[in-house]
Amino acid sequence: MVKTPMFHKKIDYISQVDERDCGVAALAMILAHYKTRLSLAKLRDLAKTDMEGTTALGIVKAANALDFETMPIQADLSLFDKKDLPYPFIAHVIKEGKYPHYYVVYGMKGDQLLIADPDNTVGKTKMTKAHFNEEWTGVSIFIAPNPTYKPTKEKKRSLTSFIPVITRQKLLVINIVIAALLVTLVSILGSYYLQGIIDTYIPNNMKNTLGIVSLGLIFAYVIQQLLSYARDYLLIVMGQRLSIDIILSYIKHIFELPMSFFATRRTGEIVSRFTDANAIIEALASTMLSVFLDLGILVIVGTVLVVQNSTLFLISLIAIPAYALVVWLFMRPFSKMNNDQMQAGSMLSSSIIEDINGVETIKALNSEATAYHKIDHEFVTYLEKSFVYAKTEAVQNAIKSLLQLSLNVVILWVGAQLVMTNKISVGQLITYNALLGFFTDPLQNIINLQTKLQQASVANNRLNEVYLVDSEFKDSHQMTEKITPNSSLVADHITYKYGFGAPAIDDVSLTITAGEKIALVGISGSGKSTLVKLLVNFFQPESGTISLGPTPLANLDKHELRGHINYLPQEPFIFSGSIMENLLLGAKPGTTQEDIIRAVEIAEIKDDIEKMSQGFGTELAESGNISGGQKQRIALARAILVDSPVLILDESTSNLDVLTEKKIIDNLMKLTEKTIIFVAHRLTISQRVDRILTMQSGKIIEDGTHDTLLKAGGFYASLFNH
């Protein structure tokens, strides 16, 4: 390991994108020190980051996977007395006495440490050893490349990747630019009208000419406003088309992501990216107009100003470096503030969505005040970040306005002296001053792109953390193997674990033949739900294979697989819309009214629907204006209408009374051609099936019929008898 204790050494700072990214952001900074640049999305996957964040073990495993040597240690402040201490390294801390977090320590000088905090509200800072020791848990991870290490760089989508989105709108952009240029030309003519009045019409008493020119200018202004309307209309159309291209592509990508993505992220973190996408849309629209329109106006008006008076024009050019300096001074602060604001907004959105979804529990626990105070704290934080950004933007705007006003004064000052020496007329001076606004406005627009492009860059980084997660259907076009009818479902020594914990599924093998009715039983946490999610390929086993007939699931198109194996989760979701719309979601093509009636009869929900005011047209709310049992039965009928050969019911009758459940099980047992896997807590179901698989600690410990397992007197018998 190489020692790099210099305080002045350049740090490749990388901030966390979401609340739980501090561990992978710290690792990303270490990797960047050794010239490897990977997205946080990639590192999250390697480190098995979950809702709780990244463990030290996860950081070690991720670094090892990237050909780095690691040495995690438990130490105290005496660590910093070592002369050959290798920097940088990762330190685990507890911030504010309650938040687990990571720092990257880059060096030490005297009593101060150079720290990089992934939380960009702190960023790169110096911290005394005493302060550091108050937060430090003593856990440190030293990371250095192996001899075989080679730097790698992951390709990311930059803002330039949106150029094709822009070029698709080229005809629209051309029309907008033409309309805007014509609007500007009319305004320039208006400025010369003022010069004509002062220098020509009034001194020469040209009343008739003045009337004709005035009426002509009024007509020109009518045309100008029509063109302004056309320009604004086309801008709205372009904004909507950009929204379709950017936001809908994001939504499409979200729907194609694997379940593991949603299992490790809060809903608000995903939803907040829509706001990020809007920042990109605004920046793209502004950039297009500035490149084609503002530059064009700048050239045209600049030429007119030179013709008016070259001396005044040279003075006007002073504005360019002055504006550029103001923009440059604010670049870094704006970048940090944009990121802070977006991250705070993401956390606030997450909390609001979670609390609204869990409002019944909040009320049941009488915890409204606690929930409110949590959101209140996050909202105040968001307002503080927004206020700091708005305040800084106001300061920058004030400086720009001061430059503009000062320039106007200087132009009038110098221009007045030129008038006094008869080098220009009063009308020319007033016209020049009026035209100057048409020069400085597009100039400001071009320079103001900095703020919007910075917002877009931050937003693009946040979007990248989603786009860089591969679609689970990425290789579907290469999947040419088809499912063989009446195939058995076979798991061969499969193992799966969440993160780096103990296996949730541990060396499981099983075979389920076509048409068989199976019950998976066991206590909570035994691995039943995880196993069936592996069977439908929501997750992929870390070792072993699952096959449908002769074909491994990994070689099958996931759309085709999930059309063959239908999974009904523990908590069925009812969507806003009518009962009929909910029933037909995912239904096989060509579903008839008879099929629907048959499905609701099997699910024992037909009578309930007919008693409702609008029958099948009854509108259901997202949260459900029906009972939990009715939800489960509608969801079951919906699953039956998919008409898949294999149906997995994950405790899908848990909210039903025993009598209704028995009727439904009787109906399902009559579906002799269908393979059904019941995940059950109630052992009444297990008495009806062909075979029972008993699970414990991720293993299948028993396999047999109800009678044989009772006679064996094992774990199943113990569960049944109790």
From Swiss-Prot:
Positions of the ABC transmembrane type-1 domain: 173-455
One annotated Gene Ontology cellular component of this protein: plasma membrane
Pfam families according to UniProt: ABC_membrane, ABC_tran, Peptidase_C39
Main location: membrane
Active site (catalytic residues): C22
Ranges annotated as spanning the membrane: 171-191, 210-230, 242-262, 287-307, 311-331, 401-421, 429-449, 518-538
Any one GO MF annotation of this record: cysteine-type peptidase activity
Chain sites annotated for binding ATP: G522, I523, S524, G525, S526, G527, K528, S529
Protein EC: 3.4.22.-, 7.-.-.-
Domain ABC transporter residues, every copy: 489-722
Domain Peptidase C39: 16-143
Stored NCBIfam families: bacteriocin_ABC (TIGR01193)
UniProt name for this protein: Mesentericin-Y105 transport/processing ATP-binding protein MesD
GN (gene name): mesD
